[in-house]
Amino acid sequence: LIFSLMLISALAKAGGMPLHTWIPDLAAEAPTSVTSYFPAAADKFLGIFKLTIICHILVSFGPTYSLVVAGIGAVTMLFATLTAIIQRDIKRILAFPVIGQVGYMIMGIGIGTPLGIAGGLFHMVNHCMYKMCLFQTSGAVQMRTGTKDLDRLGGLAKKMPVTFTCALIAALSISGIPPFNGFVSKWMIYQAALEVATRNPVYLVFAVVAAITSSFTLAHAIKYAGGVFLGSLPKELEKVK
């Protein structure tokens, strides 16, 4: 019971499922100055660190606990990333992968090996960098165009080349494409899951889920970068600088 209550508090701080529902609304409604720094907020850092301390210092973290925490991470990353694909608000498109990337951190910590824990914490640091960049680009687009609606955007790469370049680099990073930083931390988590899978095949399923989620992350990143910056430029955006 004590472990369950502490786990709930850590998930609420970090934004893991099922305590993630506040994140998309915050990202969609808050000013860019808030959303851009949200991935690196102290609360999220503390949530992940708290989870690490709970799992590996405060309790006797056996195989059952490990399976539960890693499973929560796998479900979180898959559900949140799939949900991002159906969004039309560019900030909500970016908000759900915030939750999904937390799933990778939770899974790494849940696996419990030194490589898994290091991968989860390293992914937290990487997440702060590329997600802040993505939110900054969405804020720049909203400021210049006056809209967050993906259906009213497009073709902005020529008008905002620096913003497009930053969005592209961050999109490749969050998708785990080598040689960008997201690939390194995700690879560490994959390897940790495969290492433990020799003792429990369920972790092989978790590794497959993580890899599939990365492909869905690429799909949502393409949707954001392509929908905003590529394609034809709407007439009402021809004066954008």
Regions found by a protein language model. Give the residues of each.
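Hydrophobic transmembrane alpha-helices and their helix-loop junctions in integral membrane proteins
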Residues: L1-K241
